[in-house]
Every structure is written in structure tokens, then in C-alpha cells.
From Swiss-Prot:
Gene expressing this chain: glnD
Species whose genome carries this gene: Haemophilus influenzae (strain ATCC 51907 / DSM 11121 / KW20 / Rd)
Name the UniProt record assigns to this protein: Bifunctional uridylyltransferase/uridylyl-removing enzyme
Swiss-Prot/TrEMBL keywords: Hydrolase, Magnesium, Multifunctional enzyme, Nucleotidyltransferase, Repeat, Transferase
Annotated family: Belongs to the GlnD family.
Domain HD: 446-568
Length: 863
């Protein structure tokens, strides 16, 4: 043993606790001095010695017909600092009262020492009966390892679990694969979530265990080395699995050393500490990102090889007696029982461009897969390539052909990524494989996100997508050639991690790619523009005032034409949806639809003049009047006009006819001082909070504090002040998950806002610390946009999205006598990226001195 415990001849829980702590300290101090396998072996030896000594001291070794058997991870000798001690006490017959007491004493002692114990007491008959009924018990028994006691009795157990009538090889295989399918579903079928589980995520240690279990049930192979010697895996597969296993072991061991309670999740705060223990260096996030890149690449290799070998077992062992049906596809490919196979194992080495045809055939035959033998030949061929596939003219032609095939992304590009073909084709791809960004916004690695953007684009094709993405569906389904959009998606983030502006660098890369692949000048320019501008629509819709004609004109000028607007709309929506499933909601849909429609109108009108919103104002008035006449026949035109004359024209531009009619129906006969109403019926994409009252100090502060305290997300705030000093305030909110607010929650918020607005006190902030935010720093940044505007000032704020941020900002506005006219609230992971339209106390744009003062106060107070 590397670590020799100094346990006395008479064990006590306190002495064992001290030795456990000494062992942990030894491991921390020597983590980089020994191989991870030596550390795990050493810990297992420590447990073996402890349990055997305890077994003897309690007197169980003196009993006949009773044995101590390690099972589970302990049986495999995979013991990490916080692993459970799983063991079986095997008895020949039901224990006597005396033996039961000794067993209880044995287990209680281990609990008193602080161990997490998983134990069972069974006879051989019980092992057989319960093992047949429960695949988990059966698996534990397969991994059983003798510690002490009656060895012949253990040998009988070993023979029992190998019998075909215990679990047949096929039944055992199917049950374990079904467990894997269910586990993958829990993790959304991806290893690339940014807070992964080392054990259970796809590609994690459980995938290795599945491989062990299948081999163990089939041939009795207990280790990876034994599986290699059996010929079931190739030497290069063994080498990759061994390296990946060693890295995951190191990460898990380090994680357990820094935790107090058992957990295998690499949460953000833990990633920092684990990367330090593993020796990754770099200021700030790079060290974590380097470690996680290695981690995700290990997951990918394990997932690829273990699933390939499981498929190989199914096809070559379990299905070996199946009738063979062969369909010849061409000189090099054939279908054997609905699996794509090579007719000659050297095809890919001799004609590497044919690798692309393998995936072309996947798009042509919806229900076929690639045979495991062909996949293994593919892996061998990729390792032997002397050049990138894109350097081969025939491969370039085949690569471009894939984009316009049915289900090209799902059936060709996703598998090409999975099997390493994209890395073999694109020089830049390897740099983003497994590349995470240490933030809360991007929940997938860059390569996984990229494929999800492409897959989302493909999902715009079916008619069923029209409800959620009406504009993107209409555009994408009408494109005769979708190649440019798919290529733009493939390259939009390809330059991340290099430093510099990834959009600019990516634009250069995609232009080089397009030129190499023979695209014409117009296509090259369009691709470069799409990649360079892929964030422009998102920024404009979410962080600019899209009701400002100058904003629309500037955006239209950047688009240049309808085709580019259409392309960028599809790419932007797909990018948002593929970044984080919670980002896209009905409010976002309405924002992007409005910007798209305004830009279309600008193109239609011509680019010489700004959009004339007076026509929109007049039309909204007219439509609102029609709604009121139809739905509220008791309201007179005179009373409507009396109310509307109090409102600035801006009110009729920024609200829909339905909203205007709703507000009017509430206010024409209203004589009270305060009105708070919340509805889902009249606002596009969110729940509208409408507030009418006399303007008062801290109004915005009170509203946002109350909404935040009730756990809602604020997306938009619109402050309209009438000529006589009343406010028509509208806030668009949703639940935190993006859903509309249900009736009971709306009534609750109405009451809370009414109380807050009637009180002279500011509401107390309910601040619940966010675990994830504690480990991020965001530099507070203030930017003033379009400083030449005279009527108002536009300000953009970037800061850590901590609780109470909006209330804090509004308090600053109040202290500096600033009026808030409009706000857009955007959360980007741990960052708040908020947009405000302000005037000073005289209703004018802020002077330079006022802007400098505001900037100084925000930077000072918001950290």
C-alpha cells in the first residue's frame, strides 16, 4: 500500500475517522505523484484491510457458513474518496440471533465511522431469486469479489450467476442497454451539458461499466485488459478507452477530495477547484475551459467506442444466427439487414472521399444505420489520413451535395460529428470540439451548439414548425437551396476560443471555405456577411428601441436587401433556440417578428426616408376604435377622444390596437387614483402589467422590486406620461421559465403592486443568493448610444444579473432626477444587458456632464 494506516489491534470509530482523514490528506498531498490507478487501488486496499480486521474483531470470522463479499464499485475495486461501501454478507442459512447481532454491530460500526454503507444479507437461494427479479442485483452479483469467510460458498455463488438460466446473455444485454437509453434521456442525449455528471452523463463512467458488464456476462472478462485479450476490442480502442478512463477517474477523485458529501456533478464552482488540483494553469476561466475541453473529449471517446462495441456485440454475437439479406448499393457499399456495410474493408484507405458517401447513403435510407464493422474501419481510416478531407476535390463535391439531402443534418452531419468526420474534414473544427465557455448563457459546448443550430434550421422545414416559428418556417421552407444557411451555421462560432472577435475571424474562415469549394462571389460575400453579422439582429431586437425609425433604418441599411434579412432571421432564431432551450419564448418571438416586419416596410417604402410612424399611429387608433365599438358598445366616442387627447402620439405607436382598446376600456370611466391590471389577452408574447396612477417618486423602483420579489422575469418596460402628469406604465413579464402568468399569480401580483404603490416605503428586496452567480464576475459597463439625439438619451448597461439590480438602477435614476421612458431587460446567462431611454428633469436628452455623472454613479454602486 502507498499509505499504511496505523490502526490499533482494537478498532474504534474515532481511530478509523482519524485514519480516513490521514488517507485523504495523503491523497491531496500526493495527487500528482502517483497514477490515478495507484491511488484508487491504495484506497481499496485500505478498505479491504479495515473491513477484514473489523470482521475478525467482531467475531464473524469464527462463524461457519458466512462470507463478506464486495459488490458494485467496491467489487470492481473502483473506490473514490466518497464512494459507498457496498457489500454482501453471504450466509448458508438464515442467521441465528447471535450472528444477526454481530452483523448489526459490524454495519453500525461502519456507519459510526462515517461511511455510506450499502449492504445486504442473503442466502444463495435469495441471491438467485432476487437476482433473477432485479437486473441491478444481478449486476452486483456478477461483480462480486471475495473478501473473507467461506471461499467455497462464494465459488458456488460465482457459478450460479454465470448460469444461462440466471440471466441469459441476450436478456442481460437488453436490460442493461435499456438502462442506458433511459439514462441518456435524462441527460437529453448529450454529454455536453456544462455542469455534467462524471458518472451518469452520456460518455461517463457508466458507459464504461456497461461495456464491462456485457463482457463480464459474455466471457467473464473482469477488466479492460481482459476484454482486450479476448479480442473483443482493438488495441487502439483499448488505448483510447484507457486514457479517457484515467482522465475521468482523476476528475472524479479530485472532485471527491474537495467535497464533503457524495456527488458526481461538476458544478461551476467545483470546476475551478478541480482544475487547480489537476494542475491546469491560466488566469481566470482558461484553466477551467482547458480542463473541461479534455473532459468533454474523454466523454466523447468513451461514448463513441463503448456504443460502437455494444452495437458490435448485438450485430456479431447476438444476431449471428439471423438470416442475411444483402442489397448492393454500388461497387463499395451494400446493405446487410438494413445496416450500411463496406464491400471491401480497404475502401476508405484507398478512396477516402468515399467516406462522405457513407453519410450520403444515410440520408437516402431513413431507417438504416452504419454497421459496427464499417464504423471500426472508418475510425482506422480517419487515423491514417495524411491530409484533411477538404483538400480532396472529390470530397469537396460530396460534402456540398450533402446539404440539400433530406434530413441532411440529422442523418449526415450529426453522425459525421459523432464519428469524427467533421474533424477530419474541417481544419478549424478540432479547436471547438469540447470547447465550453465558462458562463451561464451557453449550456452546450461550441461544437454541440453548432450542430444544434443546424438541426434547428432543419426543423423549420416541416409544417408543424409554423406555429412556433412562423416567419422562419415560411422563409426556410421556400428556399430552393439551403446550403448557404447551413454553411453559415456551421461557421458562425467556429473561431471561438482563439481570442479576438470570433465573428470577424469566422467570416474570414467561411470565405476561405467557400472559395475552396467553388462558390461564386455573391455566395462568398453573403456567407462572410452572415457570419460576421450573426449577432446583429439579436442585439437590435432585444437591446434597441425598434420603434425608433432611426434604429429600423440603420438595421435595414445593414441588411441591404430582403434576401439577407431572410437569411439572418432564420440563423438568429436557430442560434437563440440552440444556445439555451429556455431563451426562446412568445415574447422573443414577438420582438423579432416586429423588427422583421418594420424592416420589410422600410425596404418596401424605400431607403431615402425614415419610416413614418404617424400612419401607424393613425391606423392603431382606427383599429382600437373598431374594437371598442364592437366589444364595448357602451363607451362613447367623446369619452374615448377625451382620454386619448391626454396621450402622446408615442403611446399609439408602441401599443397594439388590442392593448389600446383594453387600456381605454379600463380608464374611460375610471375616477380612482390608482389602477393595476394584469392580463394575458392583449399583449404579444407576454403577460402585460398595466399601471395607471399619478406620477410619483420611486414608481419604477417599487414596481420592479415587487415583480422581482414575486419571482417573475421582466422583459420590457414602457413608461408613458400624460400631459396632466399621469402614467400609463406597461410591463411585459413572464414566469421564470418563459410561460405566461396564470390567473391566481396575476391576482396575487395585482394586490402586491397596489400595496407597494400606495405605500411611501420602498419594498424590501428579497435577495436569494444564486449559487452559480457566486463564481462569476461581470465588469459593469455603461454605454450611451446615438449621443446626437436631442429628445432623449439611450443607455446600455451590462452588469452581473444579481437580485435587485433593476431596483438599484431605478434608485440611481431617481437620485439623479432622471426620467425613464422605456426599458428593455435582457438576461444573458449571468449577465444583465439592459437598455434604457432617459430624459433629464427638463424632459431633454442628458448633457455630457449628466451622462458622465450617471456613468460614474452606476460604476461606483453596481459592482
Amino acid at each position: 500500500m502507498l499509505f499504511s494506516p496505523t490502526l490499533s489491534s482494537l478498532l474504534t470509530p474515532s481511530a478509523v475517522k482519524i485514519e480516513r482523514e490521514n488517507l485523504k490528506q495523503f491523497e491531496l498531498e500526493n495527487f500528482s505523484c502517483y497514477s490515478i490507478f495507484e491511488l484508487i487501488e491504495n484506497r481499496c486496499d485500505f478498505y479491504d484491510a479495515l473491513l477484514i480486521q473489523l470482521w475478525q474483531e467482531i467475531g464473524l470470522s469464527e462463524q461457519q457458513g458466512i462470507s463478506l463479499i464486495a459488490v458494485g464499485g467496491y467489487g470492481r475495486r473502483e473506490m473514490f474518496p466518497l464512494s459507498d461501501l457496498d457489500f454482501l454478507i453471504l450466509v448458508e442459512q438464515t442467521p441465528s440471533h447471535e450472528i444477526e447481532e454481530k452483523i448489526t454491530q459490524f454495519i453500525q460500526f461502519l456507519w459510526d465511522c462515517g461511511f455510506e454503507v450499502g449492504n445486504s444479507v442473503r442466502t444463495l437461494e435469495q441471491c438467485e431469486l432476487e437476482g433473477k427479479q432485479d437486473i441491478t442485483i444481478a449486476t452486483n452479483l456478477l461483480e462480486a469479489r471475495f473478501l473473507t469467510g467461506n471461499r467455497p460458498h462464494f465459488d458456488v455463488l460465482n457459478e450460479l450467476v454465470k448460469r444461462a438460466d440466471f440471466w441469459s446473455k441476450e436478456d442481460f444485454f437488453n436490460a442493461k442497454v435499456q438502462e442506458q437509453i433511459e439514462r441518456y434521456q435524462r441527460y437529453h442525449n448529450t454529454a455536453y451539458n456544462l455542469e455534467p455528471d462524471i458518472k451518469f452523463s452520456p460518455g461517463g463512467l457508466r458507459d464504461l461499466h456497461l461495456l464491462y458488464w456485457v463482457a463480464l456476462r459474455h466471457s467473464g472478462a473482469l477488466t479492460l485488459e481482459a476484454i482486450l485479450q479476448s479480442g473483443f476490442i482493438y488495441p487502439q480502442e483499448y488505448q483510447q478507452l484507457q486514457e479517457s478512463r484515467a482522465f475521468l477517474f482523476k476528475v472524479r477523485f479530485a472532485l471527491h477530495l474537495i467535497l464533503k458529501r457524495y456527488d458526481n456533478r461538476l458544478l461551476f464552482d467545483r470546476q475551478i477547484k478541480v482544475s487547480e488540483l489537476l494542475g491546469f494553469r491560466g488566469e481566470g476561466n482558461p484553466a477551467v475551459e482547458k480542463m473541461m475541453k479534455c473532459f468533454f473529449q474523454a466523454l466523447h471517446r468513451i461514448s463513441l467506442i463503448s456504443n460502437l462495441l455494444i452495437q458490435h456485440y448485438r450485430e456479431n454475437v447476438l444476431s449471428s444466427n439471423q438470416d442475411t439479406v444483402i442489397d448492393q448499393l454500388d461497387d463499395d457499399f451494400q446493405l446487410i439487414n438494413q445496416s450500411l456495410c463496406l464491400r471491401n474493408s480497404f475502401v476508405f484507405q484507398e478512396k477516402p472521399a468515399r467516406i462522405l458517401d457513407l453519410f450520403f447513403y444515410l440520408t437516402q435510407y431513413e431507417h438504416v444505420n452504419i454497421h459496427s464493422d464499417t464504423l471500426r474501419q472508418l475510425q482506422i481510416s480517419l487515423e491514417q489520413l495524411s491530409q484533411k478531407l477538404c483538400e480532396i476535390p472529390a470530397a469537396r463535391e460530396k460534402f456540398l451535395r450533402l446539404f440539400n439531402q433530406s434530413n441532411a443534418i440529422k442523418r449526415a452531419f450529426m453522425p459525421m460529428h459523432q464519428y469524427g468526420v467533421l474533424t477530419a474534414y474541417l481544419p478549424q473544427w478540432q479547436a471547438i470540439e469540447g470547447l465550453m465557455q465558462f458562463d451561464l448563457f451557453h449550456i452546450y459546448t461550441v461544437d454541440e451548439h453548432t450542430l444544434r443550430v443546424m438541426l434547428k434550421l432543419e426543423s423549420f422545414l416541416p409544417k408543424g414548425s409554423a406555429q412556433e416559428h412562423p416567419i422562419a418556417h415560411r422563409i426556410f421552407s421556400q428556399l430552393s437551396d439551403r446550403t448557404l444557411l447551413y454553411i453559415a451555421a456551421l461557421f458562425h462560432d467556429i473561431a471561438k476560443g482563439r481570442g479576438g472577435d470570433h465573428a470577424e475571424l469566422g467570416a474570414e474562415d467561411v470565405a476561405d471555405f467557400a472559395q475552396l469549394h467553388g462558390l461564386d462571389r455573391r455566395e462568398i460575400d453573403t456567407l462572410a456577411w452572415l457570419v460576421q453579422s450573426h449577432l446583429l439582429m439579436s442585439i437590435t431586437a432585444q437591446r434597441r428601441d425598434i420603434h425608433d425609425p432611426e434604429v429600423v433604418m440603420n438595421f435595414a441599411e445593414a441588411m441591404q436587401n430582403q434576401v439577407r434579412l431572410d437569411y439572418l432571421t432564420c440563423l438568429t432564431v436557430a442560434d437563440i433556440c440552440a444556445t439555451n432551450g429556455n431563451l426562446w419564448n412568445s415574447w422573443k418571438r414577438s420582438l423579432f417578428a416586429s423588427l422583421y416586419e418594420f424592416t420589410e416596410q422600410q425596404f418596401s417604402q424605400g431607403m431615402k426616408e425614415l419610416l413614418d410612424y404617424s400612419e401607424k399611429s393613425a391606423e392603431n387608433r382606427k383599429l382600437a376604435q373598431q374594437i371598442l365599438t364592437q366589444d364595448y358598445s357602451d363607451i362613447t366616442s367623446i369619452s374615448i377622444e377625451k382620454l386619448w387627447t391626454r396621450c402622446p402620439e408615442d403611446y399609439f405607436v408602441r401599443n397594439t390596437p388590442k392593448q389600446i382598446a383594453w387600456h381605454t376600456s379600463l380608464l374611460v370611466d375610471f375616477v380612482e387614483a390608482l389602477l393595476v391590471k394584469i392580463s394575458n389577452r392583449f399583449s404579444l408574447g407576454g403577460t402585460e402589467v398595466f399601471i395607471y396612477c399619478q406620477d410619483q417618486p420611486h414608481l419604477f423602483n417599487k414596481v420592479v422590486s415587487t415583480i422581482g420579489a414575486k419571482k417573475f422575469s421582466i422583459h420590457d418596460a414602457q413608461i408613458i406620461t400624460t400631459q396632466d402628469g399621469y402614467v400609463f406604465d406597461s410591463f411585459i413579464i413572464t414566469e421564470l421559465n418563459g410561460e405566461l402568468v396564470e390567473f391566481d399569480r396575476r391576482r396575487e401580483l395585482e394586490q402586491a403592486l397596489t400595496v407597494a404603490l400606495q405605500s411611501e416605503k420602498l419594498p424590501a428586496l428579497s435577495i436569494v443568493p444564486n449559487r452559480q452567480l457566486q463564481h462569476f464576475t461581470v465588469q459593469t459597463d455603461v454605454r450611451f448610444l446615438q449621443e446626437n439625439k436631442k429628445e432623449h438619451t439611450e443607455m446600455e448597461l451590462v452588469a452581473l444579473d444579481k437580485a435587485g439590480l433593476l431596483a438599484q438602477v431605478s434608485q440611481i435614476f431617481t437620485e439623479l432626477n432622471l426620467n425613464l421612458l422605456n426599458a428593455k431587460i435582457t438576461t444573458v446567462g449571468e449577465k444583465a444587458e439592459d437598455f434604457f431611454i432617459l430624459t433629464n428633469q427638463f424632459g431633454q436628452a442628458l448633457a455630457r456632464e449628466e451622462r458622465e455623472r450617471l456613468n460614474s454613479v452606476i460604476i461606483q454602486q453596481i459592482r
